[in-house]
Amino acid sequence: MIFQGGLGEFKFEMVKALVMTGFGLNCDLETSYALEVAGAEVERVHLNSLISSEKSLTPYRIFVIGGGFSWGDDHGAGVIMAMRLKHRLQDQIAAFVDTGGIVIGICNGFQVLVNLGLLPGFQWGEMKREVALIANDCGGFRDQWVTLSVNPASHCVLSRDIRSIELPIRHGEGKFFAEPGVIEKLIGRQQVFLRYAKPDGSPALAEFPFNPNGSVEDIAGICDLTGRVAGLMPHPEAFNHFTNHPDWTFFKEKYKREGKPIPEEGEGIKFFRNAVGYFE
């Protein structure tokens, strides 16, 4: 993008983001929209285009694997997609992160990242699978809105200046599980950036439906040690407009009575603004 100014022409480079598509990923349109609202130049790219080298991660700063049901969750949610990435794109993804890129996994994308071993990333370069997202304790698929608390001590780039947020979840395999020693590491290293909470912001303490899946320690999202690789089960891209919230009519009237402006953006956009803003 070229601008004219008093000192002549100058070029402003927008932050480029790649949203991966294909094989059952189905949240790419709303994810792309959220990134565009946040100020990124977005391209939706099929996995096969990356594998065939028709496209590369090199020109991009943000790489998103969004929600969906890749390969129909066969063999477990995110397993086959992770294997495809591991055998064909592992070195490229590692180089992308090593040179400062941001990787975001949302819902199915989070499942992919933990199966790939990119998260939790205790030892850079190992890509070792140390955590899992398994079947919900309730025994079925959950589609609901949840309250989330954000860890202010986390170094995750997505959660900067956010303390609590409401977002939708929709998954059948979202229970975060790991051995006690791994959980202790995650918490001690401030890699847990998002937890399920009660509406008043207090910890969910595994209570259903506030913790909708039985996640250990109410964990809803984690990042790696750099803070630039992050995964979460809730869908920030599904709260990209004020009217996405199930109680938007209540809040609209509330804001009117309080003399407050009615927002247009949904709060989920904050995560994407933080990702784009990291490079600005």
What is each of the regions a protein language model found here?
Residues S49, S53-K55, I93-A95, K128-E280:
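Amide-donor transfer/coupling interface in amidating biosynthetic enzymes
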Residues M1-I106, F110-K128, I134-R142, V216, ...:
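N-terminal beta1-alpha1 cap of cysteine-dependent amidohydrolase-like domains
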